C-alpha cells in the first residue's frame, strides 16, 4: 500500500512540475479576470479542442456555483502556426485549474496596450519623406523608385483607418475589429495618421501598397493585450490567404508592459515571413521594458527629430534596431486633410512603409527586411541613448548612391484636396543622367521626386522554432541584456 501511495505522490509531483504557471506582469496595468493562455509546443488540434471543451465545462460550473462574471469565458482563440492558445474572462478557480493543466505552457494576466503617439502643433511641413532619401537633413525632395511598394499589403494594427480618405486612392480596406465596439471606423485618428505615412499618395512611402485596417485599440487609443494578439493572428491568417505572408507587413505603433504572449505572437508572424515594424515607446527609457518592442525578431524603431538627434521622448537601448523620423510628422487625418503628430508611433510607419517598398523592389521578406534597412541606412542619429547599439537612420538607398537623383523622374503625385486654398509648389527639374560611382549599382529606373513640404490645413485638433526562440539565447540577451558582460 505504501508503495502505491509513493507512486501516486511522485506522479502528482511530475504533473505539477510540467503544468503551466501564472506569470507576474510587474507594473503593467492588468485587466481584472482577463487572462491569456498559451499551450505547450506539440499540442495537437485534437488536444486543443478537448482542452477548450474542458475549460468551458469547468468554467460554467464554477461561475454558476458562485454567480460570477456575466460576460465570461473564451473570447479569442489563437491557432496560427505553432502558437495555440486563447484568451477570456475567468474566475479564480477556473484559471487555477487551467494553469494546472500539463498541456498549458503559461497563463498571463491580460494587460492594457496603448498608442505611442501624441498630438502636437497643426499645419507644420512634414519633413520625414525627404529625409529618408537624402544624405543630410534640410532637403525638400523625396526620390523613390516607381514600383513604390506595389504588390505588398500593409496591416495597420491600430485604432482603425479612415479607408475612404482620398489619399489612399481606394487602396485601403477594412479588415477586422477586435475591440468589438460596433464602430468600424477610426475614432481616434492615430491609425489613419500612421497609415498615411505608410501608403498615402501624398505623405506615404509605399505609394502603391495596400493597407488593411485591423482595429485593436479603442477611440481612446487603448486595448487589451489579448486583442492585440488576436489582431496579429488575424493578419497572419488573412495574409496567408491573400497574396502570402512573404508579401505582408504589420505596423504596430503601440506597446505596454512586457508580455511573453504578445512577444511570442509577434515572433510567430515574423517566422512565417511577415515584416513587423514596432514603435520603441515614448517614455525615454529602455525599450526592453515594453512589448512587443522587446521581441528580438521584430524591427524596433526609435524616433529622430529634424536635426537627426534622437527625439527626447524616444525609448532607447539594445532593443532598438533603427531610427526614423518621429517628431512633428504630418499625415492623413479622419475625414480628410492632415494633422501633425509626434511619437515613436510616427517613426514606426516610416519603417513599415520603407519595408514594403524594399520588399517590392528586392523580393525579400521577414527579418531579412530589417537587416536590409540597416544596410541602406545612414549613421546619422546623435545621442541615440544609453546602451543603444545603433545610430542608423533609415534611408531608401538614395544616400548610398552619393545623394544623386536618378535620371528621368516622373511627375510627383498630386496632394489631397485641401480644405483651404494653397499655392501650388513649383515642379522640380530633373537632374541630368549620372554614372554610378565605382563599385555602386546603377540607379533604379523611373524614380519619382516629391515635394512633401506642402502644408495642409487642419480643422483642429512588437518561427524557426517558435518555442525555442522564446527560451533561446537571443531572446534572453535582449530581455536581460543589462546583466550580460
UniProtKB/Swiss-Prot annotation:
GO terms for biological process: proteolysis. Residues 20-116 form a propeptide. Residues 1-19 form the signal peptide. Residues 377-462 are annotated as: Disordered. The keyword Isomerase does not apply. Residues 34-116 form the Inhibitor I9 domain. One of its GO terms (molecular function) is serine-type endopeptidase activity. The active site is at 158 (charge relay system), 190 (charge relay system), 345 (charge relay system). Its main location: secreted. CDD domains: Peptidases_S8_PCSK9_ProteinaseK_like. It is found in: Secreted. Keywords: Glycoprotein, Hydrolase, Protease, Secreted, Serine protease, Signal, Virulence, Zymogen. Residues 409-418, 433-455 have a biased composition (Pro residues). Glycans are attached at residue 251. InterPro entries: PCSK9_ProteinaseK-like, Peptidase_S8/S53_dom, Peptidase_S8/S53_dom_sf, Peptidase_S8_Ser-AS, Peptidase_S8_subtilisin-like, Peptidase_S8_subtilisin-rel, S8pro/Inhibitor_I9, S8pro/Inhibitor_I9_sf. Belongs to the peptidase S8 family. This is Subtilisin-like protease 1. The lineage of its organism: Eukaryota, Fungi, Dikarya, Ascomycota, Pezizomycotina.
Amino acid at each position: 500500500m505504501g508503495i502505491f501511495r509513493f507512486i501516486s505522490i511522485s506522479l502528482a509531483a511530475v504533473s505539477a512540475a510540467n503544468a503551466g504557471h501564472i506569470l507576474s506582469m510587474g507594473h503593467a496595468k492588468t485587466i481584472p479576470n482577463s487572462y491569456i493562455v498559451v499551450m505547450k509546443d506539440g499540442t495537437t488540434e485534437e488536444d486543443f479542442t478537448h482542452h477548450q471543451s474542458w475549460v468551458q465545462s469547468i468554467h460554467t460550473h464554477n461561475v454558476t456555483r458562485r454567480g460570477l462574471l456575466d460576460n465570461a469565458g473564451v473570447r479569442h482563440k489563437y491557432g496560427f502556426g505553432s502558437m495555440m492558445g486563447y484568451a477570456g474572462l475567468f474566475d479564480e478557480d477556473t484559471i487555477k485549474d487551467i494553469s494546472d493543466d500539463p498541456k498549458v505552457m503559461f497563463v498571463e494576466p491580460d494587460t492594457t496596450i496603448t498608442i505611442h503617439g501624441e498630438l502636437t502643433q497643426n499645419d507644420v511641413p512634414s519633413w520625414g519623406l525627404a529625409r529618408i532619401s537624402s544624405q543630410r537633413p534640410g532637403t525638400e525632395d523625396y526620390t523613390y523608385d516607381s514600383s513604390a511598394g506595389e504588390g505588398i499589403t500593409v496591416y495597420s494594427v491600430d485604432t482603425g483607418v479612415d479607408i475612404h480618405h482620398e489619399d489612399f486612392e481606394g487602396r485601403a480596406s477594412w479588415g477586422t475589429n477586435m475591440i468589438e465596439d460596433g464602430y468600424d471606423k477610426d475614432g481616434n485618428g492615430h491609425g489613419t495618421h500612421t497609415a498615411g505615412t505608410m501608403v498615402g499618395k501624398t505623405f506615404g512611402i509605399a505609394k502603391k501598397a495596400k493597407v488593411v485596417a485591423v482595429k485593436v485599440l479603442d477611440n481612446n487609443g487603448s486595448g487589451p493585450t489579448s486583442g492585440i494578439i488576436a489582431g496579429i493572428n488575424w493578419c497572419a491568417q488573412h495574409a496567408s490567404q491573400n497574396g502570402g505572408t512573404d508579401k505582408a507587413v504589420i505596423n504596430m505603433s503601440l506597446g505596454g508592459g512586457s508580455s511573453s504572449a504578445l512577444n511570442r505572437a509577434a515572433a510567430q508572424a515574423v517566422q512565417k515571413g511577415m515584416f513587423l515594424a514596432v514603435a520603441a515607446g515614448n517614455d525615454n527609457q529602455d525599450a526592453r521594458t515594453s512589448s512587443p518592442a522587446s521581441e528580438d525578431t521584430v524591427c524596433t524603431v526609435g524616433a529622430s527629430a529634424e536635426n537627426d538627434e534622437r527625439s527626447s521622448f524616444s525609448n532607447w537601448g539594445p532593443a532598438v534596431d533603427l531610427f526614423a523620423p518621429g517628431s512633428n510628422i504630418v499625415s492623413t487625418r479622419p475625414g480628410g486633410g492632415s494633422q501633425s503628430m509626434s511619437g515613436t508611433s510616427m517613426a514606426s510607419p516610416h519603417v513599415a512603409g520603407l519595408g514594403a517598398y524594399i520588399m517590392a523592389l528586392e523580393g525579400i521578406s521577414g527579418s531579412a527586411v530589417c537587416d536590409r534597412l540597416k544596410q541602406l541606412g545612414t549613421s546619422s542619429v546623435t545621442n541615440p541613448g544609453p546602451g543603444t547599439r545603433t545610430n542608423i537612420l533609415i534611408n531608401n538607398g538614395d544616400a548610398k548612391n552619393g545623394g544623386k537623383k536618378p535620371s528621368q523622374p516622373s511627375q510627383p503625385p498630386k496632394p489631397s484636396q485641401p480644405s483651404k486654398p494653397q499655392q501650388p509648389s513649383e515642379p522640380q527639374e530633373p537632374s541630368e543622367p549620372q554614372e554610378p560611382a565605382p563599385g555602386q549599382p546603377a540607379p533604379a529606373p523611373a524614380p519619382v521626386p516629391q515635394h512633401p513640404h506642402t502644408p495642409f490645413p487642419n480643422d483642429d485638433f512588437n518561427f524557426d522554432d517558435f518555442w525555442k526562440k522564446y527560451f533561446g539565447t537571443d531572446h534572453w540577451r535582449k530581455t536581460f541584456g543589462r546583466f550580460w558582460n
